Design a protein with these regions (language model features):
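Active-site mouth loops of central-metabolism enzymes
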Residues: 5-25, 56, 73-82
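His/Asp/Glu-enriched, well-ordered alpha-helical/loop segment
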Residues: 73, 146-148, 158-240
């Protein structure tokens, strides 16, 4: 979900301009059978038209609060695309359950993650998605195909994502593993790469990365309504 002409709109997002419209969009999603809602709280790198647009707040706290309130009534979690400290702060204040991507954190934000009375379970988690951001800054434009504006925005955003992941880990916050599948160089099977990046850039030990992708992810998703046909999956394969 996004504001009109916001990040992801209209190609991959229902749009809303008021809290009332936001509630209607949530209801539409729930009727379609979704078990989680993602909102674009800030601008993003891939569709930014100006330097600084990525990470700039887009959706109002009031709209995000309406979305969270409506979704939480049905036990549905809400994740927020947020790529700046202010975007993260506003999202947490509204009651989102996860922050996707993230930014540099301070003591206030760390405290809001740890104790978030507006979130479904009283706390919020960070999902850094390093594998979505790092290729944009580590590889050349001939490989990524991004514009000069997108490159400058990615430099600003990705550094914050990496710093935030490391800070959250040091603070003992709940950190899940996600990849933002569909981004450049992020295929469906790339979860293993995210584990490597958490170890290389965010200070995780290999065991901590495995714990995040299994136990922590399970905790984050624990309240999601299960479909009639539910199959559990674990990314670990043990060879004996």
């Amino acid at each position: 979900m996004a504001i009109p002409e916001g990040h992801g709109a209209p190609l991959i997002a229902l749009t809303s301009g008021t809290p009332e419209e936001a509630r209607t969009a949530v209801a539409q999603n729930l009727k379609a059978g979704v078990n989680a809602i993602k909102i674009a709280a800030t601008g993003g790198v891939t569709d930014a038209q100006e330097i600084g647009e990525a990470g700039s707040p887009q959706m109002s706290v009031e709209q995000m609060r309406a979305i969270c309130d409506e979704a939480h009534q049905y036990g549905v979690i809400v994740g927020a695309h947020a790529q700046s400290p202010e975007g993260v702060r506003r999202s947490l204040l509204a009651g989102v359950d996860t922050i996707e991507h993230g930014s540099v954190l301070d003591d206030e934000l760390i405290g809001m993650f740890r104790h978030n009375p507006n979130a479904l379970r009283g706390y919020s988690a960070l999902v850094p998605t390093l594998s979505a951001g790092l290729p944009l800054t580590l590889l050349g434009q001939d490989a990524t195909g991004i514009t000069d504006i997108q490159l400058e925005n990615s430099k600003n955003v990705v550094g914050g994502m990496v710093s935030g992941a490391r800070q959250a880990h040091e603070a003992g916050l709940m950190i899940g593993v996600g990849t933002d599948t569909g981004m450049t160089f992020v295929p469906q099977y790339a979860t293993w790469r995210e584990l490597e990046l958490l170890v290389a850039y965010a200070g995780f030990s290999p065991a901590e990365a495995l714990h995040a992708v299994t136990a922590v992810n399970a905790s984050i998703l624990a309240s999601m309504p299960r479909p009639v046909l539910w199959k559990s999956a674990n990314p670990l394969i043990c060879l004996c």
